[in-house]
Amino acid sequence: MNPLKRRTVIAGNWKMNFTPAEATAFINEIKPMVAGKDNCDVIFCAPYVTIAAAQEAAKGSNIKIGAENVHFAEKGAYTGEVSAKMLTACGVEYVIIGHSERRQYFGETDETVNLRTKAALAAGMKVILCLGEVKEQRLSGITDEVVAMQTKLDLQSVTAEEMKNVIIAYEPVWAIGTGLTATPEQAEETCGTIRKVLASMYGEDVAESITIQYGGSMNEKNAAELLAKPNVDGGLIGGASLVAEKFTAIVDAAQ
């Protein structure tokens, strides 16, 4: 847990799971379980077709509903894509950008991640920006260099003022959906590296104010130990965000 009272953010990434009916049932189940737990923000990022149902179910609760991706253009001939303007018109405040699965399977690059980030921020959205190293980079000892370069490229031309609406999610790619988890020490070290890079870009005050999540197989068993680290300010949760009891246990660990 951070010592400077940065806002802790526990965000679920549902990925390609939950129909609208399933999302409604899940939100109705978890609403009372996380009610009153206000020491952290609780967010679920949902597939586009599920957002409206999740929003309706979450009304009156402390749960916020976000999106899992956004396109960088405001409109145009981009079949299958959704713009930040469209999302904000639907009342969506948060969006995940640059998730490792988007980079791996759909050709996202640091350049397109940067374009999407700037488009979302320009539309007034809050961005959960994902970055992290692959296994070979970790084993080669170049994790710091990789995440430093990603941070700089993904945030190119993003202003210090806009950084108020950016959350960084450090996700070691080798730990996504594998059951492997960075040790609390590895998570702390790399989140600390990201914060140092942010300080070099925006100054110490801005860097110290930014929430940095850990996102690599965080679950109900390891959350408390990870969240106890000074530079780990929350979690971006995949599999455990689909099970109300598991996600609630992570929220409890953040209290």
Model-predicted regions and their roles:
Residues 1-255:
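Active-site loop-to-helix "anion-binding N-cap" substructures in soluble metabolic enzymes
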